[in-house]
């Protein structure tokens, strides 16, 4: 009994370390509890910061489920105790004591705990998530489908009815956390997974045409500021040589006129000198 309580406490406290909030604070990202879907999980961090931060949070969340289960198996706990340790880690992720009981939805932590509990079950759940997400592009639908099948995968592969209740409780908690997503899926308002590097990049990509689109709504607007500046620079560069050529031509004409005028003025002078002699 003492081992059971100890493992439950360890699982809950490790699950309460919310990696999404820590990663966002460390790298200066928005608070996932206040921005995006307002869920401090890997998918929301993916939307807010990019793929690298989303993967980082996903790995940390999975480790929160892996480490307590490995500890329980290392201490030779019974399979039921190991399953309840996994449940405690998921509950800690959903309702963390360190972050005012506002946590994530527990999908990555559940998959990590299942990988440590029974590797094949964890692989099957992860493969189900990837297949559903690949075909329908809904993270919530993939989570609901994969976690819902976890207890039945355990019955098929393990065949131990004692581990079914804690795994079924994990499924109920995950479904409860996804209740809003479930309603949005029915209404067709659930956002799909977008593999953008950052939400800021989406804003920057759309920003150059916003002012022009407001002035000319309903029309395609092309940004020609760069082309116009290039044209003006080229025009100025072309005009400058023409002015120089014109000045050189004027100088040549004046010099020719001076040369033609000079002989006319000198010839009469020579004649007058000879006549005097």
Curated annotation (Swiss-Prot):
Composition bias, Basic residues: 240-253, 262-271
Organism expressing this protein natively: Legionella pneumophila subsp. pneumophila (strain Philadelphia 1 / ATCC 33152 / DSM 7513)
GO terms assigned for molecular function: acyl-phosphate glycerol-3-phosphate acyltransferase activity
GO cellular component, one term: plasma membrane
Chief location bin: membrane
Subunit description: Probably interacts with PlsX.
Family affiliation: Belongs to the PlsY family.
Gene Ontology biological process: phospholipid biosynthetic process
Membrane association type: Multi-pass membrane protein
Localization (cell): Cell inner membrane
Region annotated Disordered, chain positions: 207-277
Purpose of the protein: Catalyzes the transfer of an acyl group from acyl-phosphate (acyl-PO(4)) to glycerol-3-phosphate (G3P) to form lysophosphatidic acid (LPA). This enzyme utilizes acyl-phosphate as fatty acyl donor, but not acyl-CoA or acyl-ACP.
Gene responsible for this protein: plsY
Parts of the chain that traverse the membrane: 3-23, 55-75, 79-99, 111-131, 155-175
Enzyme Commission identifier(s): 2.3.1.275
Uppermost EC category: transferase
Classification via SMART domains: G3P_acyltransf
Pathway(s) the chain acts in: Lipid metabolism; phospholipid metabolism
Reaction it catalyzes: an acyl phosphate + sn-glycerol 3-phosphate = a 1-acyl-sn-glycero-3-phosphate + phosphate
Annotated protein name in UniProt: Glycerol-3-phosphate acyltransferase
Bias (Basic and acidic residues) ranges: 216-239
Keywords attached to this entry: Cell inner membrane, Cell membrane, Lipid biosynthesis, Lipid metabolism, Membrane, Phospholipid biosynthesis, Phospholipid metabolism, Transferase, Transmembrane, Transmembrane helix
